[in-house]
Amino acid sequence: MGDTSSRVEEARYWDDVPFQLPPLPFRGRVRRALADLICFVGMTAAKAARALRAVRKAIVPEKILVVRRGGLGDVLMATPLLRGLREHFPSARVYVLVSKQAVAGLQGSPWVDEILEVPRSKKDWLSLLQKLRKERIDTAFVLHRFFAASLLALLAGIPQRLGFAWKNHGFALTGSVPFSPARSQTLQIGQLLTLLGKPAADPQMEFTVSEDAGRCARKLLEGWGYDPAKSLVGIHPGGGETAGSSEPAKRWLPERFGQLAELLEQGGVQVVMLQGPGDEPFVEEALKNMTGRVLGIAAGLPLAVFAALMRVCDLVVVNDTGPMHLAAAQKVPVVAVIGPTHPAYTPPRGEMHKVIWAGVPCSPCYNPEEYIFGTRWNGKKVFQCWRGTHECMMAITPEEVYKVVAAQILALENNPYLGEQAKSAVELNS
C-alpha cells in the first residue's frame, strides 16, 4: 500500500486489511471501561443463566423484529436479510426498527410488514417497549455490535435474540455469529440467517422503485435534453451525514468531483449531479470547478425518483454514503472513493463495482468502536481526520478517478458511445 497512488479493486480484495488506530483519549477510555464492566457482568450473568436451564431449541419465527438504526445505507445493507426472512418464513410478520431519516429506504418494500421509528425521548422508548411486548414478537435480529441494541430486545421480552458476537457485547443475545469490522457488512448481516438453519442471504441489496417514480425520472431527463446514445454518469459529491452524526472525513473534496465532471464532459460523457438533502454546498462547490455544463442537477427529489434517475445512469461516482448503496441496490455500477472507511466493510461487492482507496499509512481508521467510544468525534458527533491532514482523500486525484470511470464505461456491454478523450485515458491507464 503506497501513499502516492491509489489502489483500485473490488471490495473483496481488501478483506482483513488492519486498522490504523491511535490510543483512545481519556473520555474514550472511561467510556470503554464502563462498557467493559457492564458487558463483563452481563456475560457472567448470561453464562450462569444458561447453565441453569435446558438447552433451548431454535424457534421457528412467526413475528420478527429487525433492529437497524443509522442512515439510508445502513438500512439498504439489511435488505438481503429481510428478503431472506421473507423467502424462508413467508408467513412470518416482519417489523423493522429504523431511524427516521432512513424510513424511505424501506417504503414499498415487499419484505417488510411494519416500519417502526427509533424513538427520540424516554417516554417514546417506553411506548415502543410496550408495543413490542404487546405484539409478542418471538425473534429479534439485532444488526448492531454494541450491547444497548440487544438489551432493547431483551427488555421487550423477545425470547430469541440473534446478532453479532463482538467482544462481550453480545451477552443479551441467545445466538450470534462472529463480527469483524474488516469484512463486508452486508455479507455478515446475511450470515445471521444461518442461526436459524438457513443459508446465508445473497448479498445483493434491493430498493423498490415504482412505475410513477420511473416516469418522473424519464420526464426530468427529457427536460434536460438527455441523449440515450451517449453515456450518462451520475456524480454525488455529498453525503457523510447519518442519524445523529456528521462525517466530513468520509467526503472526497467537492472541487475534485467538479474537476472529474469536467473531464467526463470533455470526453463526451453526459453528467448529472446527484444532490440529496444537505448536499447543496458540495454540489455548488463542484460546479464552481467546471467550465463546461452538466446535463442537470437532481435536487429536491423524492428518494424513489432519485433512485429511478440513478437507474438510467451507466455508472455512479460516490463517496462512502447512502447513495452508494442506493445505486448498488439497483445493480447500477459504482465507483466509490473511500478514505477512512475500511475498503472491504461498506462498499458493495461484485465485479461491476470498483473501490478507489489510497491506502495511506494512517488508513483505515473509521472503526465501529470509534463511534461508541468517541476517539475522533467531538461533542457534536462530527467524525474528523485524527491527523488533521485528510491525507487518505487528498491522495486521490480527479485524473485517477476519471481513468477508472472511463474504463468501467468501456467495459459495459453494448456501450453505445464514449468520447475519444475518455478512450485515450483508458489506454494510458492500461
Question: Which role does the model predict for each range below?
Answer:
Residues 2-430:
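Catalytic machinery of carbohydrate-active enzymes
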